[in-house]
């Protein structure tokens, strides 16, 4: 359950929730953290030490120096979300899905006398907010009798990046990003046995930051990459409607550092890769007044540090080339820990990825990936959520 307490705190005085606490889940800490491109995600997100197409603009901009021909890339994403919730003993299932653009962009390599120089521009969706929770109480006297909570939206970035070889075996890259996205949340429910409520909140997101990266090639088969996405101040502009009353609130939160390190080795027809990604969620903080009644900036930031923890995602991936068919098969697996301390021992995600890529007429690359994860969250008292999520991606790349 993500955000209903936020709305209830604003206007519904009869609820018993504390007025001096932030919600169980803040918007910026939720959603499915994805990434860019079917090939990268087919390898489990192990792309920091590969990064040899447009999607490097997100994973490791230094890898753009490996692109030797003009490349145009686009990716479609279909997400699925299913949530079997148990609220004090009674089970209900809610599901939702959506289809969106995952990325679109172009890479321009520039002819130089020695080494490589490339520029890239495009869009990458990196977070998906699709979620649904349906609840019916199996025990009399609880705060909620039933509700249907739905959230949809996305968070992505428009980026301009460049990469250059500074030595025969070392590339560096940097990008400037404009983050943009939105979340559309609604809740229909009944509480205290008699009171019906209808609530909605729409949030626009925006901010600027930088991506930095390096890629070292100690030999023909090995690549080692490091990358970071710098922290920045995210603007959140909210418009809410609760049982016919409406209003708005604008505030800012700092988005944390993201650090990545990865390596790949490609002996013959095989390629094996591994990545580590660190997100400093404890550094998330309000930059001014909070939108929650009775919660000061200092108190809100104290509660963030108490409730959230930094995460380290570990991922492994492999790719095998079938030369007779021009086909590459892919397999990936990642462990993605929950950033909420009290989400339960089964809240960490194990994400399995399967994919393939095929070269068409030497210029067009078609990549497809399917990912799935199952996990359990116990964030709200009395509520257990067994969640299954999936993503299907299709990438088309054309090199001139």
Feature-to-residue mapping (PLM):
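Transmembrane beta-strand segments of Gram-negative outer membrane beta-barrel proteins
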Residues: 22-47, 65-82
């Amino acid at each position: 359950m993500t955000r209903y307490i936020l709305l209830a705190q604003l206007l519904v005085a009869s609820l018993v929730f504390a007025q001096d606490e932030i919600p169980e889940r803040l918007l910026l800490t939720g959603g499915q953290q994805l990434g860019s491109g079917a090939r990268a995600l087919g390898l489990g997100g192990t792309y920091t030490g590969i990064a040899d197409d447009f999607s490097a603009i997100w994973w490791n901009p230094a890898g753009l120096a490996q692109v030797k021909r003009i490349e145009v890339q686009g990716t479609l994403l279909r997400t699925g979300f299913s949530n079997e919730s148990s609220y004090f003993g009674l089970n209900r299932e809610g599901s939702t899905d959506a289809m969106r653009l995952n990325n679109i962009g172009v890479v321009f390599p520039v002819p130089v006398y020695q080494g490589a120089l490339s520029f890239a521009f495009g869009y990458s969706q990196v977070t998906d907010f699709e979620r649904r929770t349906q609840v019916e109480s199996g025990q009399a006297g609880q705060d909620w009798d039933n509700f249907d909570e739905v959230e949809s939206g996305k968070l992505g970035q428009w980026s301009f990046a460049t990469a250059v070889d500074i030595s025969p075996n070392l590339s560096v890259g940097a990008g400037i990003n404009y983050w943009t996205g939105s979340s559309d949340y609604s809740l229909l429910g009944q509480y205290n046995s008699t009171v019906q409520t209808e609530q909605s909140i729409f949030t626009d997101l925006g901010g600027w930051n930088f991506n930095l990266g390096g890629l070292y090639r100690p030999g023909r088969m090995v690549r080692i990459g490091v990358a970071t996405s710098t922290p920045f101040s995210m603007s959140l502009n909210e418009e809410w409607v609760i049982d016919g009353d409406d209003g708005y609130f604008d505030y800012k939160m700092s988005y944390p550092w993201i650090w990545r390190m990865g390596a790949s080795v490609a002996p013959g027809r095989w390629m094996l890769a591994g990545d580590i990604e660190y997100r400093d969620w404890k550094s998330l903080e309000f930059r001014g007044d909070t939108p929650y009644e009775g919660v000061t900036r200092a108190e809100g930031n104290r509660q963030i540090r108490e409730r959230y923890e930094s995460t380290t995602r570990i991922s492994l991936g492999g790719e095998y080339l079938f030369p007779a068919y021009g086909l590459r098969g892919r397999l990936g697996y990642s462990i993605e820990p929950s950033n909420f301390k009290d989400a339960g021992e089964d809240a960490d995600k194990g994400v399995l990825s399967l994919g393939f890529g095929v070269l068409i007429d030497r210029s067009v690359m078609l990549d497809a990936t399917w990912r799935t994860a199952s996990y359990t969250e116990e964030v709200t008292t009395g509520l257990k959520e067994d969640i299954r999520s999936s993503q299907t991606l299709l990438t088309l790349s054309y090199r001139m």
